[in-house]
Amino acid sequence: MSHAVKIYDTCIGCTQCVRACPLDVLEMVPWDGCKAGQIASSPRTEDCVGCKRCETACPTDFLSIRVYLGDETTRSMGLAY
């Protein structure tokens, strides 16, 4: 089952979320917005099972990555934009 995965610009490019994902949903891509010069990307959300291991692994105070499940998708993502 596919879930919406949102990467926020608070990402510090640490790769913790990418390494935590058991299904390789995430990857790092070049980005000039942080010192690491990279940001997480979610090109394979169709493989996301919603385990939220990426969220748990994120070391930022404000979770830089969020997985939205079912009704949570439209409700929460609507607030983010």
Swiss-Prot record:
Ranges of residues in domain 4Fe-4S ferredoxin-type: 2-31, 37-68
GO molecular function list: 4 iron, 4 sulfur cluster binding; electron transfer activity; metal ion binding; oxidoreductase activity
Catalytic activity field: reduced [plastocyanin] + hnu + oxidized [2Fe-2S]-[ferredoxin] = oxidized [plastocyanin] + reduced [2Fe-2S]-[ferredoxin]
Location, primary (coarse class): membrane
Key word Cell division present: no
Its job: Apoprotein for the two 4Fe-4S centers FA and FB of photosystem I (PSI); essential for photochemical activity. FB is the terminal electron acceptor of PSI, donating electrons to ferredoxin. The C-terminus interacts with PsaA/B/D and helps assemble the protein into the PSI complex. Required for binding of PsaD and PsaE to PSI. PSI is a plastocyanin/cytochrome c6-ferredoxin oxidoreductase, converting photonic excitation into a charge separation, which transfers an electron from the donor P700 chlorophyll pair to the spectroscopically characterized acceptors A0, A1, FX, FA and FB in turn.
Protein name: Photosystem I iron-sulfur center
Organism for this UniProt entry: Synechococcus sp. (strain CC9902)
